[in-house]
Amino acid sequence: MKADIHPNYEVVAVTCSCGNKFETRSTLGSVLAIDVCNLCHPFYTGKQKVLDTGGRVQKFADRFGMFGTKK
């Protein structure tokens, strides 16, 4: 490997928009601002909404299902 071509891998202070702060390692710099983290993301907090696509799929099949059948 060539010497002195890789970026520095430093400790970075990460701040979320919800106010959560933690440290990790990165080559991006010393401060990193993010929009969502594990404390405010809906998937991790249990507030994720499941969309009901069954009605839409059935509506599509009712309208266009006849085109897939052979006579």
Swiss-Prot record:
What name is this protein filed under? Answer: Large ribosomal subunit protein bL31
Q: Which cofactor does it need?
A: Zn(2+)
PANTHER family, A to Z: 50S RIBOSOMAL PROTEIN L31, CHLOROPLASTIC, LARGE RIBOSOMAL SUBUNIT PROTEIN BL31A
**UniProt KW keywords:** Metal-binding, Ribonucleoprotein, Ribosomal protein, RNA-binding, rRNA-binding, Zinc
Q: Where does Zn(2+) bind?
A: 16, 18, 37, 40
Q: Which GO terms describe its biological process?
A: translation
- Subunit-level organization: Part of the 50S ribosomal subunit.
Q: Which domain of life is it from?
A: Bacteria
The annotation note on the cofactor reads: Binds 1 zinc ion per subunit.
InterPro entries from the entry?
Ribosomal_bL28/bL31-like_sf, Ribosomal_bL31, Ribosomal_bL31_A, Ribosomal_bL31_sf
Q: What is this protein's function per UniProt?
A: Binds the 23S rRNA.
What family does this chain come from, according to its entry? Belongs to the bacterial ribosomal protein bL31 family. Type A subfamily.
The answer to whether the entry has keyword RNA-binding is yes
